[in-house]
Design a protein with these regions (language model features):
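N-terminal Rossmann NAD(P)H-binding glycine-rich loop of SDR-like oxidoreductase domains
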Residues: 4-24
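NAD(P)H-binding glycine-rich loop region in Rossmannoid oxidoreductase-like domains
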Residues: 5, 36-92, 96-99, 187-188
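Conserved Rossmann-fold NAD(P)-dependent oxidoreductase catalytic core, especially the SDR/UDP-sugar
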Residues: 27-29, 35, 77, 81, ...
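Active-site beta-alpha turn of Rossmann-fold NAD(P)-dependent dehydrogenases/reductases
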Residues: 71, 106-109, 150, 200
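Substrate-positioning beta->alpha
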Residues: 90, 170-185, 195
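Flexible, glycine-rich beta-alpha linker
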Residues: 148-164
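Glycine/proline-rich active-site loop of Rossmann-fold NAD(P)-dependent oxidoreductases
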Residues: 156-161, 186-195
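Core catalytic loop region at the nicotinamide-binding pocket of NAD(P)H-dependent oxidoreductases
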Residues: 189-209
Length: 209
């Protein structure tokens, strides 16, 4: 049975993914800053590790087979937290994973992280951080999957997606539940390694990935 470390397990996507993996009777190590945010998760398959990502969190990787990095500084923080969490904590996670010989590292990135220079909005620092974190993973020795969701919504999971960017930016959206279901699917498909793709709501079944 695989054991998955979810970094940022108290965030919306991280928590949804934790629940989905647990529902499939898989072991989950949930890395969070405040374990009280997971009070509604109760399973013998769940291990909660409480640790600030700005500190050393390498111990959380012990005994894990794969990692999902779903942490983020949040939209209400400044550029300092963007650097420390979205870039530096992600880089540290990749380094820790290499030391622990993790079999598969899944990074939740963002649309636009491929080319932050093309963006001229307040999102640019965030996308630069995501770009650098993604590049560090791609240049590592790890098997990886980088998922770059479009604009996140709170719609229910349609279980149908697209990896082709829509012509209209207004259509470049994906529900958080769809993202969580994609991560769960990938975590159970060993062939899904060393791939980078954007993710949107669409018409293709998740199993088409």
């Amino acid at each position: 049975m695989s054991k998955t470390l979810i970094i940022g397990a108290s965030g919306q996507i991280g928590k949804m993914t934790s629940k989905l993996l647990l529902s499939k009777q898989q072991q989950v190590v949930a890395l969070v800053r405040d374990k009280r945010k997971l009070n509604d998760l109760d399973s013998s398959l769940l291990t909660i590790v409480e640790q600030d990502l700005e500190a050393d969190f390498s111990h959380a990787f012990e005994g894990c087979d794969q990692v999902i990095f779903a942490a983020g500084s949040g939209g209400n923080t400044g550029a300092d937290k963007t650097i420390l969490i979205d870039l530096w904590a992600a880089k540290k996670a990749v380094d820790y994973a290499e030391r622990q010989n993790i079999k598969h590292f899944m990074m939740v990135s963002s649309i636009g992280a491929d080319n932050p220079e093309a963006v001229d909005t307040e999102l640019k620092p965030y996308l630069v951080a995501k770009h650098m974190a993604d590049q560090h993973l791609l240049q590592s020795e790890l098997h990886y999957t980088v998922v770059r969701p479009g604009t996140l919504t709170d719609e229910n999971a349609s279980m149908h997606i697209s990896t082709v960017r829509p012509d209209s930016q207004d259509d470049a959206k994906v529900s958080r539940e769809n993202v969580a279901n994609v991560l769960t699917y990938i975590a159970n498909k060993p062939h899904q390694k060393n791939t980078v793709f954007e993710l949107f709501d669409g018409t293709n079944a998740i199993s088409s990935l």
